[in-house]
C-alpha cells in the first residue's frame, strides 16, 4: 500500500487507469505544519511523532484511494491549494464524481483544505477541517469562503481549534451538508498527531457520503 505519495505522479497513475477507478472514493490528505519542517521520525517536544503513515493506512484499509505527500518547507497555504484544485479538476474531468472526493486537512493542512474549498467552489466536494479554525480567522483570513459538504472537528482542550460556525454563516457558497464535532481527548493539539478513532472514524463516514 502507498504511504508517501507524490501528488503529480499518483494523479497520472490514476488517470491512466481511470476506467477501473470510477467507483472509487478518493481522499486528499494534508498533514500538519510540524511535518513540513521535520522528518517523519522526528519528535515534537510536546506531542511526539506525527504518525503520518499510520493515518494514511487507516484511510487505505477502509478502501480509499489516498493522495498525499509530505510537504517540505513552510509552504504558502493558498499557493499549495491551487495545485490541489488542479489535481481535483483532473479527476473530475476524467469521470470521477466530485462527491467521491474528500479533502482532509489537519492543523495547517486544514487551512490548505479551506483554500481548496474556496478556490474549487464546488458544492459537491467533501471536506474535513481538523483543528483549523480560530476565533480571529474571519478577521485575519477574510478571503476563505466555505464551499462543499463541510465537517469540522476540534478538540475541547486545543487552543488552536474551535467551532467554525461563524465562517460557515459568513460563506456565500451553497453548503448542502455541514456538521461540527467537538471531541474531548485531553490531548490538546496533539490529538491530530495520531490516527485516533475520535477523528478518524467520523472522517471516514463523511468521506463515504454519510452526512448524518
Region spans (language model):
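Bacterial Sec-dependent N-terminal signal peptides
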Residues: 1-23
Amino acid at each position: 500500500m502507498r504511504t508517501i505519495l507524490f501528488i503529480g505522479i499518483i494523479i497520472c497513475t490514476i488517470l491512466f487507469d481511470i476506467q477501473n477507478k470510477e467507483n472509487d472514493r478518493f481522499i486528499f490528505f494534508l498533514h500538519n505544519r510540524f511535518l513540513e519542517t521535520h522528518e517523519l521520525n522526528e519528535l515534537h517536544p510536546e506531542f511526539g511523532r506525527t504518525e503520518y503513515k499510520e493515518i494514511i493506512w487507516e484511510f487505505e484499509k477502509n478502501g480509499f484511494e489516498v493522495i498525499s505527500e509530505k510537504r517540505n518547507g513552510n509552504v504558502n497555504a493558498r499557493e499549495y491549494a491551487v495545485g490541489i484544485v488542479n489535481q481535483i479538476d483532473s479527476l473530475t474531468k476524467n469521470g470521477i464524481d466530485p462527491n467521491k472526493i474528500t479533502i482532509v486537512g489537519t492543523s495547517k493542512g486544514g487551512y490548505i483544505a479551506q483554500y481548496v474549498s474556496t478556490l474549487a467552489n464546488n458544492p459537491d466536494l467533501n471536506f474535513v477541517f481538523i483543528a483549523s479554525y480560530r476565533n480571529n480567522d474571519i478577521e485575519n483570513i477574510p478571503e476563505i469562503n466555505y464551499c462543499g459538504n463541510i465537517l469540522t472537528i476540534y478538540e475541547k482542550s486545543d487552543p488552536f481549534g474551535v467551532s467554525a460556525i461563524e465562517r460557515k454563516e459568513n460563506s456565500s457558497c451553497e453548503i448542502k451538508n455541514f456538521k461540527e464535532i467537538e471531541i474531548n481527548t485531553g490531548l490538546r493539539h496533539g490529538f491530530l498527531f495520531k490516527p485516533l478513532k475520535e477523528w478518524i472514524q467520523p472522517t471516514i463516514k463523511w468521506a463515504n457520503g454519510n452526512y448524518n
